[in-house]
């Protein structure tokens, strides 16, 4: 019978199938092949005892995120705080970029709205104008929680973002009694303390799954070509084909429509700077393999 892998603990795999959770082990061939199973994987299991089973097969994945490591995700809920820790916009743009490459819908959730700093108040509108879906929340006051519940219902979602922004607090607000560990922001450097150790799927009361995942601070870009980078910046898409040179990479080439848009204030400066950062990383990797 088919089920969904919730989590792994040691050599045991916990799979939900037919309304119950089965404690499973892997078939020997998977151990020999060193197959990596991820939360969200659809698997075929064979019962071998009361509540116990063996994983017989791994179904093809529709999507696969490396970090957070979750399979078959339908949307990524990217959580940042409007106060502490200060929004790392390069990390935000990197997460949006990766979601685009993986063809997974991204939603930006701006948490801690009840204690937001004025200097960050304009960020949701900036990203809305680019074309990203935004939601403003407060796990403390309940602002935006009903909208977030509706967004998650019936879908497999993952929460991503740095530690300390309130991912676990939001999940606790969505499903009271979940009692996920929550972290405070460290006074040293304003970084959040990690409170989630490994990814696991959580069944939501209105249907659907959410992956509670570890915090992180660095993500490598996927294996794409330098020509593809701009395609994952939505604000650059309308300018495709308008540069003087077809091979333009938008790095100060003569007649570059993207550079002109940046200078005219039509493209946000930090977004363009992050495009150049990602482009440089992709080019460096291409050269390392040439």
UniProtKB/Swiss-Prot annotation:
Gene name per UniProt: rsgA
Function description: One of several proteins that assist in the late maturation steps of the functional core of the 30S ribosomal subunit. Helps release RbfA from mature subunits. May play a role in the assembly of ribosomal proteins into the subunit. Circularly permuted GTPase that catalyzes slow GTP hydrolysis, GTPase activity is stimulated by the 30S ribosomal subunit.
Protein name, UniProt field: Small ribosomal subunit biogenesis GTPase RsgA
The species this protein was found in: Moorella thermoacetica (strain ATCC 39073 / JCM 9320)
Requisite cofactors: Zn(2+)
Pfam families from the UniProt entry: RsgA_GTPase, RsgA_N
Gene Ontology molecular functions: GTP binding; GTPase activity; metal ion binding; rRNA binding
Lineage: Bacteria, Bacillati, Bacillota, Clostridia, Moorellales
Domain (CP-type G): residue spans on this chain: 62-219
Cofactor comment text: Binds 1 zinc ion per subunit.
Keyword GTP-binding: yes
Intracellular or extracellular location(s): Cytoplasm
Keywords, comma-separated and alphabetical: Cytoplasm, GTP-binding, Hydrolase, Metal-binding, Nucleotide-binding, Ribosome biogenesis, RNA-binding, rRNA-binding, Zinc
GO-annotated biological processes: ribosomal small subunit biogenesis
InterPro entries: G_CP_dom, NA-bd_OB-fold, P-loop_NTPase, Ribosome_biogen_GTPase_RsgA, RsgA_GTPase_dom, RsgA_N
Complex formation: Monomer. Associates with 30S ribosomal subunit, binds 16S rRNA.
Binding annotation for Zn(2+): 243, 248, 250, 256
HAMAP family: GTPase_RsgA
GO CC term (a single one): cytoplasm
Residue positions binding GTP: 111-114, 161-169
Enzyme class: hydrolase
Enzyme Commission (EC) number: 3.6.1.-
Family designation: Belongs to the TRAFAC class YlqF/YawG GTPase family. RsgA subfamily.
């Amino acid at each position: 019978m088919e089920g969904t892998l919730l989590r792994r603990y040691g050599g045991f795999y916990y799979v939900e199938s037919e309304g119950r959770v089965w404690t499973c082990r892997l078939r020997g061939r998977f151990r020999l092949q060193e197959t990596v199973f991820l939360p969200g994987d659809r698997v075929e299991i064979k019962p071998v005892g009361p509540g116990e089973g063996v994983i017989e097969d791994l179904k093809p994945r529709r999507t696969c995120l490396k970090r957070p490591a979750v399979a078959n995700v339908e949307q990524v809920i990217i959580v940042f705080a409007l106060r502490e820790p200060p929004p790392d916009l390069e990390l935000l743009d990197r997460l949006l970029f990766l979601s685009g490459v993986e063809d997974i819908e991204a939603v930006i959730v701006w948490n801690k709205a009840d204690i937001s700093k004025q200097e960050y108040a304009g960020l949701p509108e900036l990203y809305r104008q680019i074309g990203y879906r935004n939601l403003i929340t407060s796990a403390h006051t309940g602002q935006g929680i009903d909208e977030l519940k509706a967004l998650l219902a019936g879908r497999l979602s993952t929460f991503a973002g740095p530690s300390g922004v309130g991912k676990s607090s939001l999940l606790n607000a969505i499903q009271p009694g979940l009692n996920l560990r929550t972290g405070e922001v460290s006074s040293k450097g304003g970084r959040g303390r990690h409170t989630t150790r490994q990814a696991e799927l959580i069944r939501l009361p209105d249907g659907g799954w959410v992956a509670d995942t570890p915090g992180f601070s660095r993500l490598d870009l996927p294996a794409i070509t330098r020509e593809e980078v701009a395609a994952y910046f939505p604000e650059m898409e309308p300018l495709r084909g308008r540069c003087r040179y077809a091979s333009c990479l938008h790095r100060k080439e003569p007649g570059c429509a993207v550079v002109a848009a940046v200078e005219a204030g039509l493209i946000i400066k930090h977004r363009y700077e992050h495009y150049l950062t990602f482009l440089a990383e992709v080019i460096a990797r291409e050269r390392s393999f040439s």
